[in-house]
Amino acid sequence: MPGIKEIRTKIKSVQNTRKITKAMEMVAASKMRKAQERMRAGRPYATKVREIAAHLMQANPEYSHPYLVEREVKAVGVVLVTTDKGLCGGLNTNISRVTLSKLKEFEQRSIKVQATAFGNKGLGLLTRIGAKLVSQEVQLGDKPDLDRLLGAIKVQLDDYLEGRIDALYVATTRFVNTMRQEPVFLRLLPLSNGLDDPFQSGVETLAKTAEIKSDYSWDYIYEPDAKSVIDDLLQRYVEGLLYQAVAENMASEQSARMVAMKSASDNAKKVIGDLQLVYNKTRQAAITKEISEIVGGAAAV
């Protein structure tokens, strides 16, 4: 059985650890609220872009943008979104597992893969497995910089437009609520006919929106022309989805970290209680032994 001094040292060590995890829990809770606000702030933008695009495409049915054209898949691009830091439970492990499964599936179908990594954890994974990296962006901080994200993803978008890849996927963690985050592997390009927002449930698709708008006889005045406006809108829409993927992951990261640190703090409290019980028993045993020795010595005299 460990001595009293050793147990006291362990209790002190666990108490110090609990102070750290408690502080990290509070910091994560504060960052989580801000990350959720940023994540939700981008959703109305995507919804409005979908509505405008629906109207434009209905008014110009003869025009087909490359982002909407299905083609035989021989090569794909994958954007893996992870965190830069750990201590967020199984967040990175879960999305890594899903991504590896999909990459194996592509390999079995003889489909070439080129990857973009957002976050140190994803970069480390793709490097270890020897994936073809065409771009990367790490140390994104607590607030994603759109210019940095677009700079990294431009390679993939250009390759898609030039036909070097036939589809573009994004692997990220979708924020459901504070206690639940789910890894998702979504096709970004070509866009589905409905232009569904992969990060919202119950949102109208482009097709449904177009159907609703079909009663209107008005139209926009285009400058310079409708096709140019559609091109710009779809480009902004895809960029917005990529930003949303990173924002969702950041909100998920802070939520998972807060939950993980709370769990660590609760476990530390339990360990302290167990150690305190052992300490009391050990101390009581030592006192009893000393009393017995004194009584035994007095009887011998």
Swiss-Prot record:
Localization of this protein: Cell inner membrane
Protein's UniProt keywords contain Cell inner membrane: yes
GO biological process, one term: proton motive force-driven plasma membrane ATP synthesis
Chief localization: membrane
Annotated membrane topology: Peripheral membrane protein
Keywords linked to the UniProt accession: ATP synthesis, Cell inner membrane, Cell membrane, CF(1), Hydrogen ion transport, Ion transport, Membrane, Transport
Record's GO cellular component terms: plasma membrane; proton-transporting ATP synthase complex
An MF annotation (GO) of this entry: proton-transporting ATP synthase activity, rotational mechanism
InterPro entries: ATP_synth_F1_ATPase_gsu, ATP_synth_F1_gsu, ATP_synth_F1_gsu_CS
PANTHER family in UniProt: ATP SYNTHASE GAMMA CHAIN, ATP SYNTHASE SUBUNIT GAMMA, MITOCHONDRIAL
Cited function: Produces ATP from ADP in the presence of a proton gradient across the membrane. The gamma chain is believed to be important in regulating ATPase activity and the flow of protons through the CF(0) complex.
Family: Belongs to the ATPase gamma chain family.
Quaternary state and interactors: F-type ATPases have 2 components, CF(1) - the catalytic core - and CF(0) - the membrane proton channel. CF(1) has five subunits: alpha(3), beta(3), gamma(1), delta(1), epsilon(1). CF(0) has three main subunits: a, b and c.
Protein name as annotated: ATP synthase gamma chain
Organism classification: Bacteria, Pseudomonadati, Pseudomonadota, Betaproteobacteria, Burkholderiales
